[in-house]
Amino acid sequence: MSAQFVAFLLIAFNLSLPANAFISDGANASVGLFGNASSCPKAAKFGKGPPKSCTIPSDPNNKPASQLESWFTREMFEDLFPFANLGWGPSSCWPYSYDAFKIASRYFPEFGTSLNVNNTVYTADENKKRDLAAFFAHAIQETGENNNYLYTALPDQEASNCFYRGGFYNWFEGGPSSNFLNPETPGHSPTDGNSCTSAGRYCSASDQITFFYPCSNSTISNPAAPYKGCYFGRGGIQISYNYNYGQFQDWLKSVNITVDLLKEPNLVMTKMDPPLAIMASLWFYMTPQPPKPAMHDILMGNWNSGAQNSAAGYDGPIFGPTSLIINNECSGEDSKNPGGPGESRRIKAFKWFNGYFGSPVGPEHTLSCGKMPVKLNAIPHYQSYQPDWSSSWKPERCDCAPASYGGLVYYFDPNYYPASFVAQNDLNRKKCIETVYANPSMYFMDKKNSLCLNY
């Protein structure tokens, strides 16, 4: 039976390959249906390659090893991402390496480990592998080499084996040579992102966003790329816009890492103590931003999709709604390989990585969010803390209360979010109250219409 036919059966009947289907050849990574990196054509390389000496990834907090490290090895990482870092491969001198991935995962001990997962649809082993498959699938779409030429040069399965090994290729949005950067330094070194053109600023402004996460207006004497406050996409699953850089900065502070990403956003690509390029991506993958659950929690079934979605099969541990969180993509999977970008690429990559790990993809119709009746932003629940309008007119201290619309001070509804985030609610309520007094005008409050400000 040919490898191509086996692959067809796996996908057509939603089957998974047993983990022991891989045969180690001793020198290389896994060989078999999903091949290995050494059998792939070399990727295009950009830049001069990694330096001979550098600052390697380290963790100032010395976090203990994650359970992920017990099963996802350096050999597996380097087999899956041989073309990382603009084609040069994993390197501890550059943003993407197993060491950087390992350190980042230690800050998220639930990632790829099945900790605090209660679904009975999949085994603990299947859950942890599906978690990694989803994260890597989104990285393929966001920063993969995505070399369509492989499908004209190789048989279909062999082409897929190399295509989906192209993750963590790009550093910057629009890479490998980004139009957001100076044409003379277009993104072939991590430091190239220290300044940008006006198109790369990605500065979102409103009264509340500017209060919490103001953009830097600093410039340098470089007419081709004069701006320092550049919040375009960086990292494996690219975070973008000042409010995401700012929220990531807030989280870093909560784990004893002080860094000013609003002033120096390119530290996401250059900081190595700890390395932030993969950590920023894991933070985005693991963290809910109401009304959006964390992608991880959707994969693990730790979310509440609502009655209408549940009746349509969109509940529990599924993949499809995760595509809503990054780019609101619900166009489904293309029939041919490699297909186009967007949700189709995410789905195909998710299938490939699950095949590699020997884990199931889940019901076919839930791989896309296209038939999901109620999208994430329309599921009714409390989402943020806002001034308590029921008491703001009273001559008593101002308070905040959960509101059914979004904001930058999150409320984690206990019916929709995991307990670890619900535990943040009391602190977030106090934060909201502080901002009411610090800047009441952004809530359209003053001492005349809101007597509580006098107390």
Name every feature range the model reports, one short phrase each:
Residues 131-136, 226-227, 231-236, 275-280, ...:
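Extracellular structured ligand-interaction cores
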Residues 2-21:
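Cleavable N-terminal signal peptides of Sec/SRP-targeted secreted and luminal proteins
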Residues 16-219, 224, 291-455:
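Cell-wall glycan-active module
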Residues 98-108, 230-311:
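Alpha-helical segment that forms one wall of the substrate-binding/catalytic cleft
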Residues 222-225, 265-267:
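Short secondary-structure capping micro-motifs at structural edges
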Residues 1-4, 453-455:
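A positional/structural detector of protein chain ends, strongest at the extreme C-terminus
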